[in-house]
From Swiss-Prot:
Pathway named in the protein's UniProt entry: Amino-acid biosynthesis; L-arginine biosynthesis; N(2)-acetyl-L-ornithine from L-glutamate: step 2/4
Encoding gene, per UniProt annotation: argB
GO BP field: arginine biosynthetic process via ornithine; L-arginine biosynthetic process
GO molecular function annotation: acetylglutamate kinase activity; ATP binding
Keywords, sorted A to Z: Amino-acid biosynthesis, Arginine biosynthesis, ATP-binding, Cytoplasm, Kinase, Nucleotide-binding, Transferase
Protein localization: Cytoplasm
Protein name: Acetylglutamate kinase
Amino-acid positions noted as binding substrate in the UniProt annotation, renumbered to this chain: 66-67, 88, 193
InterPro entries named in the record: AceGlu_kinase-like_sf, AcgluKinase_fam, ArgB, Asp/Glu/Uridylate_kinase, Glu/AcGlu_kinase, NAGK-C
Length: 295
């Protein structure tokens, strides 16, 4: 490394110092998903980001998805993927595959990546320590022709109804980094598959997290010119949904951000997981890396 490169790195570290101090002993929940999960180089960059957060005194918690991997495993086993209103129908056979892929395969891959940095990660799902309880999701869809709403039966798709933070508080006082799969039991004894975004929001809300980061395949919320909006209040975000600036798949993402803030999260960021070290750029630099939504 040349002297000039060393000087640049030193300046970057000096600039990061106040942000490291700001987030020391704070909880940051990161929802890991999208393109980054399928790219080995981005996966290693993400793991090193999480490790550096821990080494800087932050309490990072990772929640992950895995929709494409679930679909691939169902195809491999000859089980047809069924969707209602764009949502996966999870029958009894499918929920077993979902749990195997999320809490088994994907979860342990992420744990291994973080452990390779020298930090200690531990793989969990909502069942561990009775951390999360769910109930059958109540979803409806409106027929565009008749304007009549009908209830969707999505099988064992769930909504979070309770989060017990005891285990997560215990891990926060340890050297462990929790990596959590969005699978949880119901009081009825069934296992439920939960949307990873809403699961992460529920975890972050229960912990009154300082930040919740959603790693996506887009830079963040864009204005009508296609430019990144750096910060929005909840009221401004709702107005952009109402006027159509926020549309399509970004609407449920932003609505989840709003719900998380209502549950006690101090700020939620939508950022591009395809950017290497996006987490560090968001947390430890002045301009961040995505769209920050605040109360």
């Amino acid at each position: 490394m040349s002297a000039s490169e060393s000087e640049i790195q030193a300046r970057l570290l000096a600039q990061a110092l106040p942000y490291m101090q700001r987030y020391e002993n704070k909880t940051i929940v990161v929802k890991y998903g999208g393109h980054a999960m399928g790219n080995a180089e981005l996966g290693r960059a993400f793991a090193s980001d999480v490790a550096l957060l821990k080494q800087s005194g932050v309490n990072p918690i990772v929640v992950h998805g895995g929709g494409p991997q679930i679909g691939a495993m169902l195809n491999k086993m000859g089980i047809e993927s069924k969707f209602e209103g764009g949502l996966r129908v999870t029958d009894e056979k499918t929920v077993e595959i979902v749990e195997m892929v999320l809490a088994g395969s994907i979860n342990k891959e992420i744990v291994a990546l973080i452990n390779q940095t020298g930090e200690w990660a531990i793989g969990l799902c909502g069942k561990d320590g009775n951390m999360v309880f769910a109930e059958k999701a109540k979803k409806t869809i409106r027929d565009p022709d008749s304007n009549i709403e009908r209830v969707l039966d999505l099988g064992f798709v769930g909504d979070v109804v309770e989060v017990d933070r005891t285990l997560l508080d215990l891990l926060a006082r340890s050297e462990m980094i929790p990596v959590i799969a969005p699978v949880a039991p119901g009081r009825d004894g069934h296992t439920y598959n939960i949307n990873a975004d809403t699961f992460a929001g529920a975890i972050a809300g229960a912990l009154n997290a300082t930040r919740l980061l959603f790693l996506t395949d887009v830079p963040g919320v864009l204005n009508k010119k296609g430019e990144l909006i750096k910060q929005l209040s909840v009221a401004e975000a709702r107005a952009l949904i109402a006027d159509g600036t926020i549309s399509g798949g970004m609407i449920p993402k932003v609505e989840t951000c709003i719900e998380a803030i209502g549950a006690g999260v101090q700020g939620v960021v939508i950022l591009n997981g395809k950017t290497a070290h996006a987490v560090l750029l968001e947390i430890f630099t002045e301009h961040g890396a995505g769209t920050l939504i605040v109360p």
